[in-house]
């Protein structure tokens, strides 16, 4: 049976992640409070941010930038600004 969490991003009960995907305290917080669906949405945004800003994930500054955007998106409901991207109507 799938593990469920109350997803802070989607504000509903949903399937939780199968295992902690991100290290550290932030990773534990994501595992405990974010659903698979919300994590998948973040991965799409993350890919767009990496491409738009031409981030090299080997650089600590690039990882810190993405971590900041990830935390804001998942927990503070802050949509990352991606030039030229218009979110679909809900």
From Swiss-Prot:
<comment type="function">
    <text>Could be a mediator in iron transactions between iron acquisition and iron-requiring processes, such as synthesis and/or repair of Fe-S clusters in biosynthetic enzymes.</text>
</comment>
<dbReference type="Pfam" id="PF04362">
    <property type="entry name" value="Iron_traffic"/>
</dbReference>
<dbReference type="GO" id="GO:0005506">
    <property type="term" value="F:iron ion binding"/>
</dbReference>
<dbReference type="GO" id="GO:0005829">
    <property type="term" value="C:cytosol"/>
</dbReference>
<comment type="similarity">
    <text>Belongs to the Fe(2+)-trafficking protein family.</text>
</comment>
<dbReference type="GO" id="GO:0034599">
    <property type="term" value="P:cellular response to oxidative stress"/>
</dbReference>
<keyword id="KW-0408">Iron</keyword>
<protein>
    <recommendedName>
        <fullName>Probable Fe(2+)-trafficking protein</fullName>
    </recommendedName>
</protein>
<dbReference type="InterPro" id="IPR036766">
    <property type="entry name" value="Fe_traffick_prot_YggX_sf"/>
</dbReference>
<dbReference type="InterPro" id="IPR007457">
    <property type="entry name" value="Fe_traffick_prot_YggX"/>
</dbReference>
């Amino acid at each position: 049976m799938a593990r469920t969490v109350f997803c802070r991003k989607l504000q509903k009960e949903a399937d939780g992640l199968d295992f902690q995907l991100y290290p550290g305290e932030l990773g534990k917080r994501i595992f405990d409070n974010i659903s698979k669906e919300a994590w998948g949405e973040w991965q799409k945004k993350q890919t767009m941010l990496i491409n738009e800003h031409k981030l090299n994930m080997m650089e600590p500054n690039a990882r810190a930038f993405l971590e900041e955007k990830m935390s804001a998106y998942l927990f503070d409901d802050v949509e990352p600004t991606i030039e030229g991207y218009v979110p679909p109507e809900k």
